[in-house]
Amino acid sequence: MPRREMMKCLFVSESCVCHTDLAIKDGVLPFPLPAVLGHEGSGIVEAVGPGVKHLKPGDAVVMTFASCGHCASCEHERPSYCLDFGAQNYSAQRADGPVLLSQGDEVISGFFFGQSSFSSMAMAREHNLVKIDALVDDAPIELLGPLGCGVQTGAGAVMISLDVRAGRSFLVLGGGAVGLSAVMAAKLRGCSRIIVSEPSAAKREQALALGATEVIDPLNENLVERVQQITEGQGCDYALECTGLVSVMEQAIDSMAMRGQLAVVGVPPKLDATAAVSPLALIQKGLKLMGVIEGDSCRVYSSTSCTRSSRLGVFRSPR
C-alpha cells in the first residue's frame, strides 16, 4: 500500500458500531489487541498525499472496506471478494509502515478495514473512500457512516446479490441495521410482501415503519408456519438471513418458495458452526443458497444507488 495513496480524514462525529467490531472485542474474530476498531466512518478530508487524484481537503466522504484494487475480483467490480481481503482489512497495520498508533512503547493495532474510525482522526486510502456529492448534501454527515458497511450489506444483498424483482415476496431474518436496510431496498424494488422476523418488539415496529408488510415474533410464533400462512402456502421468493444463527438459516430454507433464493450475510457466533441442509430439498424446490459479503457492493454502488435513494427518502437512518 504505497504511502503516497494515504490521506488524513477528520471525523465530525463518532463512528457507528457494527457487530464485526463487537465480535473482535469479544474474541469471536481474531484481531490483535489492544486496537482501535471502527469501520463505518464518515467525515471531512483534512489532507491528502501527492498520489491522491480525486479527493481534496474539505471533501465529505464515507469510508468503506479496503481492497487491493488489482486482483481478479477487484478488476471485475467485486472488491468485497478481494483475494487479499484479509490482509487489507484485518492486518492491524499498514503494509508499508510506519506504525500509525501507539501508546508509549506499546503498539496499538489499527488500520481496521483500512480506516479504524473509532478516533477523531483516521488514515485511509483513496480507494476505500466515497465522496458524498450534492445528492445528499442536506443529510447530516454523521448519519452516513453506515452506508459504507451495514446499509450496503443489506441493500446490496437485495439490489445486487439477489436482484429482487417487483411483485415478489421477501423475507428478512433479523431486524437490525442490515435487515432494516434490506427492508428499505425491497420496498424500493416494489416487493408485494416484505416479511420481517425479529424478536424485539421495537425493531418490529421500526420494520413496519420502514416498509415491512408483516412482522413475525420468532420467540412466540412458528416462523415457517407464519410465512406459509402469510404467503398462502407459497413460501417466499427471496430471503436474507442476517442473524448468523444456524437454526434460523435452516428455518429460512424451509420457508422458501419454489425456485426461491436465500442470501446469508449473518456471521455465526461460533465460526465453525455448521447447518443441516438437505440436498434433496434444494433439488426438489430448485433453491439457490448464497453467501454474501458487503452486499456484493463496490464504490460505484455505494456512491450512486444508496445516496440517490437516500435523497428520495427511501433510505432513512434507523435511529
UniProtKB/Swiss-Prot annotation:
Cofactor: Zn(2+)
Enzymatic reactions: a primary alcohol + NAD(+) = an aldehyde + NADH + H(+); a secondary alcohol + NAD(+) = a ketone + NADH + H(+)
GO molecular function: alcohol dehydrogenase (NAD+) activity; S-(hydroxymethyl)glutathione dehydrogenase [NAD(P)+] activity; zinc ion binding
Chain positions recorded as Zn(2+) 2 binding sites: 68, 71, 74, 82
GO BP terms, alphabetized: formaldehyde catabolic process
SUPFAM superfamilies: GroES-like, NAD(P)-binding Rossmann-fold domains
GO terms under cellular component: cytosol
Record keywords, A-Z: Metal-binding, NAD, Oxidoreductase, Zinc
Top EC class, one word: oxidoreductase
Amino acids binding Zn(2+) 1: 18, 39, 149
EC nos: 1.1.1.1
Co-factor remark: Binds 2 Zn(2+) ions per subunit.
Keyword presence, NAD: yes
Family named by the database record: Belongs to the zinc-containing alcohol dehydrogenase family.
PANTHER family: ALCOHOL DEHYDROGENASE, ALCOHOL DEHYDROGENASE CLASS-3
Protein's name according to its UniProt entry: Probable alcohol dehydrogenase
UniProt source species: Pseudomonas sp
